[in-house]
UniProtKB/Swiss-Prot annotation:
<comment type="pathway">
    <text>Cofactor biosynthesis; ubiquinone biosynthesis.</text>
</comment>
<dbReference type="InterPro" id="IPR007715">
    <property type="entry name" value="Coq4"/>
</dbReference>
<feature type="binding site">
    <location>
        <position position="178"/>
    </location>
    <ligand>
        <name>Zn(2+)</name>
    </ligand>
</feature>
<keyword id="KW-0809">Transit peptide</keyword>
<feature type="binding site">
    <location>
        <position position="179"/>
    </location>
    <ligand>
        <name>Zn(2+)</name>
    </ligand>
</feature>
<keyword id="KW-0479">Metal-binding</keyword>
<feature type="transit peptide" description="Mitochondrion">
    <location>
        <begin position="1"/>
        <end position="54"/>
    </location>
</feature>
<keyword id="KW-0472">Membrane</keyword>
<dbReference type="Pfam" id="PF05019">
    <property type="entry name" value="Coq4"/>
</dbReference>
<dbReference type="InterPro" id="IPR027540">
    <property type="entry name" value="Coq4_euk"/>
</dbReference>
<feature type="binding site">
    <location>
        <position position="194"/>
    </location>
    <ligand>
        <name>Zn(2+)</name>
    </ligand>
</feature>
<comment type="function">
    <text>Lyase that catalyzes the C1-decarboxylation of 4-hydroxy-3-methoxy-5-(all-trans-polyprenyl)benzoic acid into 2-methoxy-6-(all-trans-polyprenyl)phenol during ubiquinone biosynthesis.</text>
</comment>
<keyword id="KW-0496">Mitochondrion</keyword>
<comment type="subunit">
    <text>Component of a multi-subunit COQ enzyme complex, composed of at least COQ3, COQ4, COQ5, COQ6, COQ7 and COQ9.</text>
</comment>
<dbReference type="GO" id="GO:0031314">
    <property type="term" value="C:extrinsic component of mitochondrial inner membrane"/>
</dbReference>
<protein>
    <recommendedName>
        <fullName>Ubiquinone biosynthesis protein COQ4, mitochondrial</fullName>
        <ecNumber>4.1.1.130</ecNumber>
    </recommendedName>
</protein>
<keyword id="KW-0862">Zinc</keyword>
């Protein structure tokens, strides 16, 4: 959730990036105009020119490259632009998504995810029900994490620029399960913790966007926080992420009632160095309990 923090970058970079802000709409208009040119009978894209799924925006290689560069500048200039961060992830995914899909196919649990294609949002997850799960279960831990961080499961951008519907779902699944990674790794939502998780995700999944974010993001930290990131969090992230189970293969929704400690042991995950939380755990648990009691009555 790097997008929740404000970038501290020179005004010149922000100004240079402004023309890229409307790239998706510009590219869509370009495609429509190009297709209407007289004598234009063959497609402008080598694979497909019609949407393959709802929300799909087909791009040819040139458009993909332009959007990748533009979204990189916009993401750096204003990390709050979640649409640009998402576009960067999609346009730079390359061969990583087929590799992640293959990992899922090699896993019984991952194959069920691909077959059933569950979605993660407040319409598909009964947060009130999870709040009634016993203490120590993943479902209860997830609700407490949401309360502690002040976030919801409804903030993820839909996929637009990946042609293959199955690979588009793999990207969407990664995006929507990102908060589960925060929860299982016991990391809050702040810049240094998000960067630590990006290093973890790169070691675990190999998505190029996670490495780009991990390399560029530290410029927004104070020298003290940057020193701690590289001295404590990055070694944990690379070692733990690289040796643990590939989290893209986990069917999280089937594990609400499982003990979190048992899940960590199964996945090969251990806690990172102690992170800085904006809300104490006791306060978050009390708030979650009040919410649960209110729903009961």
């Amino acid at each position: 959730m790097l997008s929740s923090a404000r970038a501290r970058l020179p005004i010149s970079l922000c100004s240079f990036s402004l023309p890229f802000a409307r790239l998706p709409n510009t590219l869509s208009r370009y495609q429509e105009t190009w297709q209407r040119l007289p004598g234009r009978t063959h497609p402008t894209r080598s694979i497909r020119t019609t949407p393959a799924y709802e929300g799909h925006i087909p791009l040819n290689w040139f458009e993909n490259a332009v959007l990748a560069v533009g979204s990189a500048f916009m993401s750096l200039a204003d990390p709050r632009r979640g649409d640009m961060v998402a576009a960067l992830g999609e346009t730079t995914a390359g061969p990583t998504l087929p590799s992640l899909r293959d990992r899922m196919l090699d896993s019984i649990e991952g194959r069920r995810v691909l077959m059933q294609r569950p979605r993660v949002n407040s319409s598909t997850i009964d947060l009130n029900k999870l709040a009634h799960y016993p203490e120590g279960t993943f479902g209860r831990a997830y609700v407490t994490w949401l309360e502690r961080c002040g976030v919801t499961p409804d903030t993820r951008e839909p996929v637009h620029y990946i042609d293959d519907p199955e690979l588009a779902y793999v990207m969407q699944r990664y995006r929507e399960c990102h908060d589960f990674y925060h929860c299982i790794c016991n990391l809050p939502v702040n810049v240094e913790s998000e960067l630590a998780l990006k290093y973890f995700e790169f070691a675990n999944l190999g998505l190029p966007m996670t490495l780009l974010s991990a390399l560029v993001g530290p410029v927004r930290l104070t020298p003290q926080k940057r020193q701690r990131l590289f001295a404590e969090f990055v070694p944990w992230a690379l070692k733990c992420g690289g040796s643990s189970r590939s989290l893209i293969t986990v069917y999280w929704e089937e594990r609400w009632g499982q003990n979190v400690a048992d899940m960590k042991t199964e996945f090969g995950i251990w806690d990172p160095p102690e992170a800085r939380w904006s809300k104490p755990l006791s306060e978050a648990k009390a708030a979650a309990e009040r919410h649960r009691t209110a729903q009961t009555h």
